[in-house]
C-alpha cells in the first residue's frame, strides 16, 4: 500500500504553473495599432513615401534654394526657354524631342535652339529658361510648408475647441456646436478665398487663410471622443482626487484622443494642399517668382496647348503627394479603430 502511495501522482499537476503563464506580454495601444498598420501594405508604402519626401524637402532647402530656382538670364531665354525633358537620347519621353503643334515630325529642340550638349533638364524648362525640376522641388517644399503650418493651426484650435466643448457640455457645448455649424454652412473654399483676398498674396497669408477655417472637422471629432471618455471611471476617479480640469485634459483625455487627432490631421493635409493649388490658380497664391505646386500648375495651364509637360509634371507630383497622405490616413484610421474598418 505504501508503494502505491509513493507511485501515485495527480494527473495534470506537473507543469501547471508553466501552462498558466502568459506566452507573450500584453501589447500597448500603440504597439497593437502598429501591428495592425503593418498589415496594410499600401499605407505602409505611403508612410515611407511621406517620410522620404519630408527628408528630401529638408535637404533640398540647402541644395536647391529659392534664389537658384528663380534665377534666369533674360538674354538666354530664347535658347533655354520651353525645353522639353531630357536625360538621354534613347529614352522615349526624356530624349529632348518635341512635336510642335501643327507639325507632323518631332524635332530635337535642344539642337534647334543651340543648347550645349552638356546641358540637360530632367523636367524641362519654363518660358524663361528656368529648370522645372528645381522649381518643382522648391514648389513641393513650399506646398508642404503651407500644408503643415496650416495643419498646426488646425491642430491647436480644433483640439482646444473640441476639448472645451466636450468637457463643458450643456449650454456651452450647444452654443459652441452652433458656431461650428454656422462656419460649416459656408463652403470652406469660399471662406478661404475671401480671406485670402483680404490678406493678399504670400505664404503667411495662405497659411492663415487656410488654417483659420479648417479646424471645424477636428473640433467635432475631438468633442465626440471627449464626450465618450469624460464619464469613464479613470476620469471620474481623477475628479474625485481633486485634479484640475487642465490636468485631466492633458493627462487623461488628450492621450486617449490622440489616435483620432493624428488620423484627422492626415486627412486634412491633402485638403490644405489642394486649397493652396486653387488659390494659386486664381492668382491668390504665393508671390512670384516663388513657386509652389499650385503656381506651377497655374503656369502650366497657360501653356498646356503647346507645352503640356509644364502642367503634367507638377500635377502628377501634387496628385501623388495628396494620395499618399490619404492612404496613410486611411491606414492609421484602420489601425487606431479596427471596428470602423469592419463596419
From Swiss-Prot:
The keyword Transmembrane applies. Pfam families: BPD_transp_1, OppC_N. The gene is dppC. PANTHER family: OLIGOPEPTIDE TRANSPORT SYSTEM PERMEASE PROTEIN AMID, OLIGOPEPTIDE TRANSPORT SYSTEM PERMEASE PROTEIN APPC. This is Dipeptide transport system permease protein DppC. It is a multi-pass membrane protein. Its main location: membrane. Residues 140-329 form the ABC transmembrane type-1 domain. The complex is composed of two ATP-binding proteins (DppD and DppF), two transmembrane proteins (DppB and DppC) and a solute-binding protein (DppA). Belongs to the binding-protein-dependent transport system permease family. OppBC subfamily. The keyword Cell inner membrane does not apply.
